[in-house]
Amino acid sequence: DNQGDKVPDLKVRAVFEALRYVYVSNHQILGGSWGMHVIVPLVHQSLDTPIPGIDDGKTFGLGDITINPLIIGWHLSPEWHITAGLDIGLPTGKYDSADPTDSIGANYFSFEPVVAFTYLAKSGFEASAKLMYNIKTKNDDTNYQSGDEFHVDYLIGQHFGPWSAGLGGYYLRQTTDDEVNGKPVGSDGNRGKVFAVGPAIKYDYKNMSFMGSW
């Protein structure tokens, strides 16, 4: 719940396969390389809930696609790299306000400024962090406005030829209230916060990378 306590007998399981296409051009903007990306998620989701009126269920399908038409990367040295851009979330995933078990998408647009830092030593050691601030539009089906969120993805790992392995995770904190019909939800605006860490592995093959994390 929003106090960080477990909800008894509530279980949500989700597995994502995110297909990310990245294009980096030879054009320069503000001294950095211009590129773009598209992220297409496929989602396997199951829900077991004790909440009255909501049935257990499973679903699979296309999630909400993310596009970023403007990514700028600066390579300050062989070790230090910085990128900045604006991710735009599109409500492409299936959604049914009357059936949460069959809903994969969020049913709103999101706009997320992104700044990422990477340190990659000659020894293969890597430390990376990606800072984001997520701003959402209102879900018109429910008249629910989710609050803004600040979050950080991080990774510490080691490269071994085409392989790399390490620890990765994220920290998220909601900075503004959730609202329904223009009024805050509950006494605390239903503000959430999450911290997660787990193993991560990546394999690079030609112009492709395969990543897994838990």
Q: Where do the language-model regions lie?
A:
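Outer-membrane beta-barrel pore domains and translocons
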Residues: 1, 39-43, 87-91, 132-136, ...
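Outer-membrane beta-barrel translocator domains and adjoining extracellular loop/strand segments
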Residues: 2-6, 47-54, 84, 94-102, ...
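Long, hydrophobic/aromatic-enriched structural stretches that serve as scaffold segments
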Residues: 4-68
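Residues that define the transmembrane beta-barrel architecture of outer-membrane proteins
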Residues: 11-19, 56-66, 105-111, 144-150, ...
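Residues on the lipid-exposed face of transmembrane beta-strands in outer-membrane beta-barrel proteins
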Residues: 18-25, 67-73, 86, 113-119, ...
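Short loop/turn motifs that connect adjacent beta-strands in outer-membrane beta-barrel proteins
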Residues: 25-35, 74-82, 97, 121-125, ...
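Transmembrane beta-strands of outer-membrane beta-barrel proteins
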Residues: 32-38, 80-86, 111, 125-131, ...
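Outer membrane beta-barrel transmembrane domains
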Residues: 141-214
